[in-house]
């Protein structure tokens, strides 16, 4: 009887420990389901979003950052286009993101991180605001340029759902003085035009 009790107690302890260990994890099937939903939406909206919703910012750009009234950097490449598989994509540096939603009239897009994203961003969503492209005050002799701002939450990560990213308040964001402030307390990023179509993909 004592042996049976000990075995039962041991099994309960292991079960409790296993459940505690799993309590902070995401169900793999649910994560995959969310990703599939996002990718299907991205694929469905690929042509429409890229060719219409992103009409004024499509192309390849040099990526810089503004602070204290000056924009510098412009060493990494930003591509906003449609990749060979038909998805709308936003790529910059080593980052590669699927564009899920965009609006050329409201000047925003939402992209989804890949499942391999780090810093707690796997499968999450981020909203990007941009300004109307201009043909003056563009660094490095570029023919046109625009400012953009990444809208993050208080943890500086993406949003868990598409609705969260879509409905996040942007009333505190302003492009009135993008070289100095207006993007979460910082200056905006700036993109200077290189070409209409990307020549290679990550």
Question: Model features per residue range: what roles?
Answer:
Residues 64-157:
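N-terminal glycine/threonine-rich, aromatic-flanked beta-hairpin/loop signature
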């Amino acid at each position: 009887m004592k042996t049976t009790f000990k075995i039962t107690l041991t099994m309960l302890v292991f079960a409790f420990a296993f459940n505690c260990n799993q309590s902070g994890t995401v169900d793999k099937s649910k994560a995959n389901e969310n990703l599939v939903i996002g990718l299907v939406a991205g694929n469905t909206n690929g042509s429409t979003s890229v060719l219409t919703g992103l009409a004024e910012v499509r192309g390849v750009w040099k990526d810089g950052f503004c602070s204290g009234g000056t924009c510098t950097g412009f060493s990494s490449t930003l591509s906003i286009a449609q990749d060979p598989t038909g998805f709308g994509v936003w790529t910059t540096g080593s980052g590669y993101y699927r564009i899920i939603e965009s609006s050329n009239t409201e000047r925003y897009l939402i992209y989804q991180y890949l499942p391999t994203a780090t810093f707690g961003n796997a499968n999450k969503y981020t909203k990007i605001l941009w300004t109307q492209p201009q043909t003056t005050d563009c660094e490095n002799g570029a023919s046109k340029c625009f400012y953009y701002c990444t809208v993050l939450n208080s943890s500086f990560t993406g949003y868990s759902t598409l609705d969260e990213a879509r409905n996040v308040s942007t009333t505190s964001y302003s492009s009135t003085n993008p070289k100095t402030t207006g993007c979460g307390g910082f200056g905006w990023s700036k993109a200077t035009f290189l070409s209409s179509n990307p020549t290679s993909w990550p």
